[in-house]
A protein has these predicted regions:
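Noncatalytic alpha-helical scaffold of FAD-dependent oxidoreductases
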Residues: 1-149
Length: 149
């Protein structure tokens, strides 16, 4: 995940992987061990190798150890799945949800080109899907999901 800087659908809420990488140890192409950063949040002077290596796909170094900042797990989360075969409708819905007061923590769009029998969470679908995740306290999540529907 770090080498690819893969953050997933929650990126706009919690940030990218590189935002949470505090330090690393790795081996470069010459076989030399490289260390950068540390185990606590701090400001960096000069080049921030953690940010440079995140997303380098292992071309600069192979990471052998990482120190990361973690976030507390939300009390609950729910994902609203909407069937919509048209890209424009899906993008409109995602845009509306992001600009609303529901404060979504994730969003994803699966276009209908996945074809028939696309399986998501053990449910088979046959068209485009939009997913919007809401996280937080149970009562708050239920209210915000109801606002979206």
């Amino acid at each position: 995940m770090v080498a690819c800087n893969f953050a997933g659908s929650r990126r706009f809420k919690v940030g990218s992987v590189r935002d949470h990488l505090l330090g690393f140890q790795g081996v470069n192409g010459k076989g030399e061990t490289i260390k950068s950063g540390g185990t606590v949040v701090k400001n960096v002077t000069g080049y921030d190798l953690c940010k440079i290596l995140s997303g380098s796909f292992g071309t600069l170094t192979v990471l052998t150890e990482i120190s990361i900042k973690v976030l507390p797990k939300p009390e609950t989360s729910k994902t609203l799945i909407i069937k919509n075969p048209h890209v424009k409708k899906a993008l409109d819905y995602l845009g509306q949800s992001l600009s609303s007061s529901t404060d979504p923590s994730g969003g994803v769009f699966y276009p209908d080109y996945f074809g028939k029998n696309f399986i998501l969470n053990d449910l088979t679908h046959d068209g485009g899907l939009t997913g919007i995740r809401i996280e937080g306290p149970v009562n708050s999540v239920d209210q915000r999901i109801n606002k979206l529907t």
